[in-house]
């Protein structure tokens, strides 16, 4: 009996030891121990879309934890709501459940209210929202109170490009619309391409009899989609000769509205449009607007699928193009610490190599040749991002 009791105790102790080893290993490997013991600084960030995979990347977060002792919490926000809703965690169903319930009952809260869960930083996915947040809120338009901005800037960048196919690009080269330089394809006459679309030219008019219908570049809807708005901002800049002014915007909006109408059906998200481009091929989507990062992300996440289509794919760089810049806005010292960390060279390399973001980090070495497609080392021909009021006028006119 005593022998059995000792054996049972031994088994229990052995099991407890195994569990303890597993727990210790888990905490060590995942840096959870540092979080639980307070060795990591938790930083809360209101975050726009388009960079979720990068922010969740295991290697990125390991650098943040190991090198900078940061546990970053990125809450998902739409860009527009960062202006109109109180920038507190409770606005997106996080933080204090008591305050969430009271907000649901109609009670109003702001960043100045007692007990709310505040943010250390804002990470928008569009520069116009970064620039606009730094201004005083327009209370008459229903804008919410804002944090004091301590620092910030452009952190992740990717240019607008047009994805197409070999046969289409060959035809555009013959039309003197596209030029190839060192294996990179540039749309050197965007005005001519815009005119072709406005004139209703057909694909068959440029020697592509296998394609049905009029020449078109598919995009997301600028009225409801930030990428679509960025693209139409580029078109407006091109039509305005590179400099949008109060006078020429009114002259060019009717032409842009005509372009918008002729574009027909539009996808809701760039991810849906890019997937359709890949799945339906040249017959379904001869040309689409997207970000440069999408193809690099696809090449890394789905190498087998990428290898099947890469010989037929062409990336066209409009000259000029426009940057889509994800901007980091610092509200607190903790936010400043994360901002510094995101400018780390190693994190910058991951941002480019795995997700296609250009960070502009000094010392960053981008091996564009490794992608196997025509991607330029640097992009110099760009237009300035439009201000919020210009975008608002553009979008209102298109509705």
What are these regions (language model features)?
Residues 2-25, 331-399:
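Extracellular/periplasmic juxtamembrane helices and adjacent flexible linkers that interface
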């Amino acid at each position: 009996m005593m022998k059995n009791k000792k054996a049972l105790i031994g088994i229990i102790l052995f099991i407890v030891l195994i569990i303890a080893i597993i727990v210790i290993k888990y905490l060590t490997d995942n840096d959870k121990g540092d979080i639980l013991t307070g060795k990591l600084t938790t930083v809360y960030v209101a975050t726009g879309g388009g960079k979720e995979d990068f922010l969740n990347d295991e290697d990125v977060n390991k650098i943040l934890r190991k090198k900078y002792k940061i546990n970053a919490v990125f809450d998902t926000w739409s860009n527009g709501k960062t202006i109109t809703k109180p920038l507190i965690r409770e606005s997106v169903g996080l933080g204090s459940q008591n305050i969430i319930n009271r907000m649901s009952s109609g009670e109003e809260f702001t960043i100045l209210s007692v007990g709310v869960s505040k943010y250390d930083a804002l990470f928008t996915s569009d520069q116009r929202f970064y620039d606009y947040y730094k201004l005083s809120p327009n209370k008459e338009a229903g804008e919410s109170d804002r944090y004091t901005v301590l620092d910030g800037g452009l952190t992740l960048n990717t240019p607008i490009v047009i994805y197409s196919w070999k046969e289409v690009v060959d035809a555009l080269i013959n039309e003197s619309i596209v030029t190839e330089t060192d294996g990179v394809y540039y749309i050197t006459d965007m005005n001519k391409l815009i005119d072709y679309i406005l004139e209703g030219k057909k694909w068959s008019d440029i020697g592509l009899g296998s394609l049905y219908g009029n020449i078109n570049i598919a995009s997301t809807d600028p009225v409801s989609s930030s990428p679509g708005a960025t693209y139409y901002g580029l078109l407006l800049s091109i039509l305005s000769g590179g400099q949008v002014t109060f006078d020429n915007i009114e002259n060019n909006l009717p032409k842009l509205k005509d372009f918008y109408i002729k574009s027909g059906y539009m996808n809701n998200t760039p991810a849906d449009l890019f997937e359709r481009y890949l799945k339906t091929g040249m017959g379904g989507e001869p040309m689409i607007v997207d970000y440069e990062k999408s193809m690099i992300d696809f090449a890394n996440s789905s190498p087998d699928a990428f290898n099947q289509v890469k010989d037929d794919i062409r990336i066209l760089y409009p000259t000029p193009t426009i940057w889509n810049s994800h901007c980091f806005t610092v509200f607190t010292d903790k936010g400043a610490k994360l901002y510094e960390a995101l400018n780390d060279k190693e994190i910058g390399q991951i941002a480019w190599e795995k997700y296609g973001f250009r960070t502009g980090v000094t010392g960053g070495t981008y091996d564009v040749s490794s992608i196997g497609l025509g991607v330029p080392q640097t992009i110099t021909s760009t237009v300035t991002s439009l201000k919020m009021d210009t975008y608002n006028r553009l979008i209102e006119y298109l509705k």
